[in-house]
């Protein structure tokens, strides 16, 4: 016999005759011990605890200065199969952190039913970032904005008619607490001190743009802590103009701003209040988002790179929003208000990494910069290869299921109700009634209100299309006999994701009236049909074979075959308005008006062989066919509405008008408030800019408020621009309505070759008692447009604009 002493007190005894077995055992044992050693060391490397904290003028990681260079990505806007590719792209760009929102409404689509699996697995996303050596900043809301449906809040909150969102409303806060606990279960174990990679967690989101309510923000902070986020710094973000409104003493304060901003000016007030705090721009906007019916947005690469250089040279941390925007798949796009404007499905954002994950000029310019700010001894990894791209030959649709021939179960209601009251979150809703009496020609059908795009039918004949974006809530009727079937089909285009308008119920929100002269009659007794956008609802319709393209709302079905898969862009340019599903995946919205004409189709959702595609077109296509392109089309507008707010031949006449107030603005950034000596009543508010601060012709305004009798800003919900003497639309969307779009980084700007004076007339929608106004100049550094001298005119009736050319 032979005794082999393998480990201190562990003996294996083998009979010599079995030496071959022994040798085999030793070989396997060696392999096992080697793999165990490697695995143990790998696991230890992945779970090593660290400490992240705020130090004097810098963040500290394990006691050493650390500059956060974060890339904002959204797991919801990237197919799960591509998560790691996009994270690797960010690392190759020079980032050390990934910043993410948590989208409440995608995890709790039905009250009480949470989903953190698959595409929604936020813990897996964070672990993927850690796998590639990236830290994570978590922004759990509950409100996130992000150009996302209702700012991330679940639609079913609106079933409670008196709910006050983003306040201490008891039901709202109860649901926020439940949601935060679920997020904590997923992510609190991944805090950096526990061996994970989460280094910071945000409390609420840009609340200063919503209101002043420190008790509410404090309550959200407490819920975040109670959910388990107690071991990493908590922070709150806002704009430099309003961050003090709700600033809590025990949170880190950060500010958000865009490319071209004056860095020193943005942090000036924060440094005065907290001279030793680490500075961070928690959203440095690399580009901007697109709206249906408006030009594709871009921002100069050089301005973005220069802004980041300015921050790094000052030891300021940043998160680049967006580093990769991706795609708002399905129905999840949000909207702005006022004026209502829905977001496109593409969230390309003109970011350094394109919608499809490609490198851009911005990517390489920024990568070249960030190479200079690496820790000693580090180099950037190679840029990952782009994913395969394919073309798909044109294929046609011959199977059609008319929507009116595929009605779901009917529901009855005496009075009009929005879709939430029928337990519907998204999609379209059909309201049907019969006219109780003959309707005379010229009678007005008034809908209060259309949310968001409606088609009106009488006995199946299309009478009108009404668009909330344009304030279209009425139509003139022809003669209609008693008993005529009146159908109003309303599509929900995306709930508002910013400001108080997030209480955005869909369908018809209040009532429908017939108005003739001074008489009005509210229509009652409605039959309602709900059309959600779930694949389970739309997949099994009664399709007919036809080569005739209908002009009525319909579902279309086809298949296409592939020899190989890859990313592509579905060309929807011959279609009207609706949504697309491929192999059960909701791809997004299309609308002929543009600017987006293609839908990004990830190759990971395609398959070799036969693929199924379904299209819902509420308007009807010109040609029912689709092909896959190798490049997107994001900048083709077909909107026929005028871009600017001055009709041909108009020229504002002010010579005989009474000046309500005159003065001069002080130079520099930041809000300026002006109070009038006396109260003035009026509906039409005119600002005339008389001279610039610098030697240029340009006038520019970022935001504008009119102060009411209580000294507070009046509602801008229904404001319209009646007149602007000049608006720059060649280099960007610089139209006058930007002064009340609630975004400080967008602005009205006049054309550079049009001299002063410049005039702007706002229709306040009703007579207001005006006590003054607030004005925010354009925020960018060393850019023109600062106004010096001005005059104010206020009238109850509209101004004289001369003869309009028809």
PLM regions with names:
Residues 45-97:
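N-terminal carbohydrate-binding accessory modules
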Residues 112-118, 142-166, 217, 221, ...:
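Aromatic- and acidic-residue-enriched segments that line the glycan-binding/catalytic groove
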Residues 647-655, 664-720, 725-806:
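Aromatic, loop-rich ligand-recognition surfaces of beta-strand-rich domains
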Residues 441-457, 560-583, 590-591, 613-616:
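Aromatic-lined ligand-binding clefts that engage carbohydrates, nucleic acids, or primary amines
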Residues 488-493, 615-621, 688-695:
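Short beta-strand-plus-loop segments that form exposed binding edges in beta-rich domains
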Residues 260-354, 358:
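Catalytic-core region of carbohydrate-active enzymes that cleave or remodel glycosidic bonds
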Residues 174-245:
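Active-site neighborhood of glycoside hydrolase catalytic domains
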Residues 83-148, 221, 225:
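Aromatic-lined substrate-binding rim segments of carbohydrate-active enzymes
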């Amino acid at each position: 016999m032979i005794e082999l002493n393998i480990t201190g007190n562990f003996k294996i005894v083998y009979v010599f005759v079995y030496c071959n077995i022994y040798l085999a055992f030793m070989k396997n044992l060696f392999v096992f011990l080697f793999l165990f050693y490697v695995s143990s060391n790998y696991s230890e490397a992945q779970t090593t605890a660290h400490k992240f904290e705020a130090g004097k003028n810098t963040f500290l990681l394990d006691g050493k200065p650390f500059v956060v260079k974060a890339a904002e990505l959204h797991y919801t806007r990237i197919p799960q199969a591509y998560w790691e590719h996009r994270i690797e792209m960010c690392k190759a760009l020079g980032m050390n952190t990934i910043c993410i929102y948590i989208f409440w409404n995608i995890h709790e689509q039905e009250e009480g039913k949470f989903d953190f699996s698959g595409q929604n697995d936020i813990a897996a996303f964070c672990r993927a970032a850690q796998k590639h050596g990236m830290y994570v900043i978590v922004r759990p809301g509950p409100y996130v904005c992000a150009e996302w449906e209702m700012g991330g809040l679940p639609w079913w909150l609106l079933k409670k008619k008196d709910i006050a969102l983003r306040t201490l409303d008891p039901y709202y806060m109860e649901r926020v607490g439940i949601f935060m606990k679920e997020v904590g279960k997923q992510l609190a174990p991944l805090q950096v001190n526990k061996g994970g990679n989460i280094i910071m967690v945000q409390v609420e989101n840009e609340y200063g743009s919503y209101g002043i309510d420190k008790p509410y923000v404090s309550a959200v902070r407490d819920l975040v802590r109670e959910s388990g986020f107690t071991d990493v710094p908590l922070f709150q973000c806002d704009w430099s103009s309003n961050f003090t409104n709700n600033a809590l003493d025990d949170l880190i304060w950060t500010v958000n701003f865009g490319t071209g901003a004056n860095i020193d000016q943005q942090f000036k007030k924060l440094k005065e209040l907290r001279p030793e705090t680490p500075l961070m721009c928690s959203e440095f906007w690399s580009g901007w988002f697109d709206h249906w019916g408006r030009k594709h947005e871009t921002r100069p690469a050089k301005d973005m790179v220069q802004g980041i250089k300015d921050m790094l040279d000052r030891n300021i941390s940043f998160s680049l929003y967006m580093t990769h925007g991706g795609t708002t798949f399905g129905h999840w796009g949000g909207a702005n208000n006022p004026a209502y404007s829905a977001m496109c499905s593409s969230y390309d954002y003109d970011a350094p990494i394109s919608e499809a994950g490609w490198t851009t000029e911005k990517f390489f310019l920024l990568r070249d910069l960030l190479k200079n700010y690496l820790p000693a001894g580090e180099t950037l990894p190679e840029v990952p290869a782009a994913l395969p791209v394919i073309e798909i030959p044109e294929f046609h649709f011959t199977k059609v299921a008319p929507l009116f021939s595929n009605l779901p179960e009917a529901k009855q209601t005496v009075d009009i109700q929005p879709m939430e009251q029928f337990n519907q979150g998204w999609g379209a809703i059909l309201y049907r009634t019969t006219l109780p009496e003959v309707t005379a020609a010229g009678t007005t059908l008034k809908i209060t209100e259309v949310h968001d795009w409606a088609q009106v039918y009488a006995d199946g004949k299309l009478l009108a299309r009404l668009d909330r974006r344009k304030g279209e809530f009425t139509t003139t009727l022809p003669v209609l006999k008693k008993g005529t079937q009146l159908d109003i089909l309303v599509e929900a285009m995306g709930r508002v994701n910013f400001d108080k308008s997030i209480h955005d119920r869909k369908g018809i929100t209040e009532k429908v009236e017939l108005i003739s002269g001074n008489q009005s009659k509210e229509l009652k007794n409605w039959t309602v049909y709900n059309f959600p956008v779930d694949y389970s609802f739309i997949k099994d319709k009664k399709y007919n074979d036809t080569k005739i393209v209908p002009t009525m709302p319909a579902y279309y079905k086809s298949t296409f075959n592939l020899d190989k898969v890859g990313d592509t862009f579905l060309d929807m340019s011959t279609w009207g308005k609706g949504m697309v599903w491929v192999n059960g995946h909701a791809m997004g919205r299309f609308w002929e008006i543009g600017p987006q004409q293609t839908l990004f189709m990830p190759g990971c959702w395609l398959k070799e062989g036969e693929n199924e595609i379904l299209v819902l077109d509420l308007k009807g296509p010109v040609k029912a066919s689709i092909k896959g392109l190798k490049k997107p089309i994001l900048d083709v507008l077909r909107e026929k509405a005028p871009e600017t707010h001055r009709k041909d031949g108009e020229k504002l006449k002010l010579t005989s008008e009474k000046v309500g107030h005159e003065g001069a603005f002080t130079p520099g950034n930041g809000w300026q408030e002006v109070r009038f000596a006396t109260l003035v009543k009026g509906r039409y508010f005119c600002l005339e800019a008389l001279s610039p601060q610098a030697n240029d012709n340009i006038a520019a305004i970022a935001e504008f408020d009119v102060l009411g009798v209580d000294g507070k800003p009046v509602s801008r919900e229904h404001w319209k621009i009646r007149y602007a003497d000049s608006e720059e639309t060649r280099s960007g969307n610089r139209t006058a309505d930007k002064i009340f779009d609630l975004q400080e980084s967008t602005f009205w700007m006049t054309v550079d070759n049009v001299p002063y004076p410049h005039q702007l007339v706002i229709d306040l929608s009703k007579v207001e008692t005006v006590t003054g106004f607030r004005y925010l100049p354009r925020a960018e550094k060393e850019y023109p447009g600062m106004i010096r001298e001005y005059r104010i005119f206020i009238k109850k009736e509209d101004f004289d604009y001369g003869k309009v050319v028809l």
